[in-house]
Amino acid sequence: MSLQVKDIKKSFGNGQSETPVLKGINFNVNEGEFVILNGASGSGKTTLLTILGGLLSQSSGDILYNNQPLFTRDRKASELRLNEIGFIFQSSHLVPYLKVKAQLTTIGKEAGMTMQEANQRAETLLKQIGLNHRLTAFPHMLSGGEKQRVAIVRALMNHPKIILADEPTASLDAERATEVIEMIKNQIKSKKMIGIMITHDKRLFEYADKVIELDDGVITNA
């Protein structure tokens, strides 16, 4: 299993006002690999990650998953996006009226788990990040760091094949950031997932199999 990014370009605007943001991005990520995207603000990192997740269309280029187009209009590709890609954003976006456990079991049930399976997975993942005591808490009862850790667990609930993360440790202290990255990496390795994460925290680079540096829409360390 691999993710192949082939000559991805993205521009915003039209005609003479068109602004290129990505200028031909190429790289591969194999199963079990954890890749970090790094670069200054405006380098194109978030645009690239958003395209990889299917939330934004590229202007040109291809994204292949197991040598097949990742994003098409057919039903199989839609199911892949729903069930096999896990997103972790800077903000947690938790549902305010659901308790922590329900935030997770809802995702599990949507992915086809039984309630028992969803409960077990939620409890296992929360224990790994030290939040098993917060099962019945509502989002407003959590700290910013706790909310983000719940969001990370939520992205892992449905056993995704691809994890895309945008600064997932930005609201965490150094100790918790390390715990979370170790958890994400262990999941990627043990479940043979593909992991791509944006971070500015160079202390976390050592956990990556490779670091891709972007500058002004191009990869500079290819």
UniProtKB/Swiss-Prot annotation:
It holds the Pfam family ABC_tran. It is a peripheral membrane protein. The complex is composed of two ATP-binding proteins (HrtA), two transmembrane proteins (HrtB) and a solute-binding protein. Its EC number is 7.6.2.-. One of its GO terms (molecular function) is ATP hydrolysis activity. It is found in: Cell membrane. The keyword Manganese does not apply. ATP binds at G39, A40, S41, G42, S43, G44, K45, T46. PROSITE patterns: ABC_TRANSPORTER_1 (PS00211), ABC_TRANSPORTER_2 (PS50893). Residues 3-222 form the ABC transporter domain. SMART domains: AAA. This is Putative hemin import ATP-binding protein HrtA.
